[in-house]
Amino acid sequence: MNAGDEVIVPSYTFVSSALAFVRQGAKIVYADSESDNPNIDTSTIEKLITKKTKVIVPVHYAGVSCDMDAIMGIACRYNLLVVEDAAQGIDSYFTSPKTGLKTSLGGIAHMAAFSFHETKNIQCGEGGLLIINDERLVRRSEIIWEKGTNRAEFYRGEVNKYGWVDLGSSFLPSEYTAAFLYSQLCELEKIQLSLIHI
């Protein structure tokens, strides 16, 4: 992602969907929502694509899946990355009308992000989860996650010492946070059922 690159985001979303890209100097291009829900209207995406477009960010609003067949098809035609904003998509699925295949949200695009904000079904106050579904993105993601170091490669025995190789930050959860999240995952079905009745 370079300054001036463009990212297509639905017009109805929280600021976090665009913020990571804006911090890298990207220009946000807003796509219309569907007429019957706030998800991205896939029929509006192609006319927004330019030579500077790099990423499409479908937001699965309230855990309702976007048309990922259409979005991934467009991304393939134009050689674009897709980053699913699955912040509200824990335990939600996309069923392909083409194949009938049911896939977890976050498991379709090149990358996906889930939120553990206190307003989500599974929460720990703040934080989230990054899913990497494209091998080309794993190394850089690990470096950013490990404070800019190649420590993950060191732990796997791929290098004999680790060092700073890029920019990064500290994204590691505490053991308490992980335990709190794990206990909710163990009770996910019960949590989801209780929310249906609210």
Predicted segment positions?
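Hydrophobic beta-strand core residues of beta-sandwich domains
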Residues: 1, 105-106
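Conserved small/polar residues in nucleotide/adenosyl-binding loops
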Residues: 196-198
